[in-house]
Curated annotation (Swiss-Prot):
GO MF terms held by the record: cytochrome-c oxidase activity
Positions of post-translational N-formylmethionine modification: M1
Localization per Swiss-Prot or TrEMBL: Cell membrane
Record-annotated disulphide pairs: none
Organism in which the protein naturally occurs: Thermus thermophilus (strain ATCC 27634 / DSM 579 / HB8)
EC number of this enzyme: 7.1.1.9
Catalytic activity: 4 Fe(II)-[cytochrome c] + O2 + 8 H(+)(in) = 4 Fe(III)-[cytochrome c] + 2 H2O + 4 H(+)(out)
Membrane topology: Single-pass membrane protein
Enzyme class: translocase
Transmembrane intervals: 4-34
Gene Ontology cellular component terms for the protein in this record: plasma membrane
Keyword Repeat belongs to the record: no
This protein's record includes keyword Cell membrane: yes
Designated name of the protein: Cytochrome c oxidase polypeptide 2A
Length: 34
């Protein structure tokens, strides 16, 4: 589990950014529809 902490951080960062972009897209569509 402690082999590559940087790799784990990178995975968490990518997941966070993906979720953030996903929710921004959902919110944009929801807002566009009124």
């Amino acid at each position: 589990m402690e082999e590559k902490p940087k790799g784990a951080l990178a995975v968490i960062l990518v997941l966070t950014l993906t979720i953030l972009v996903f929710w921004l897209g959902v919110y944009a569509v929801f807002f566009a529809r009124g």
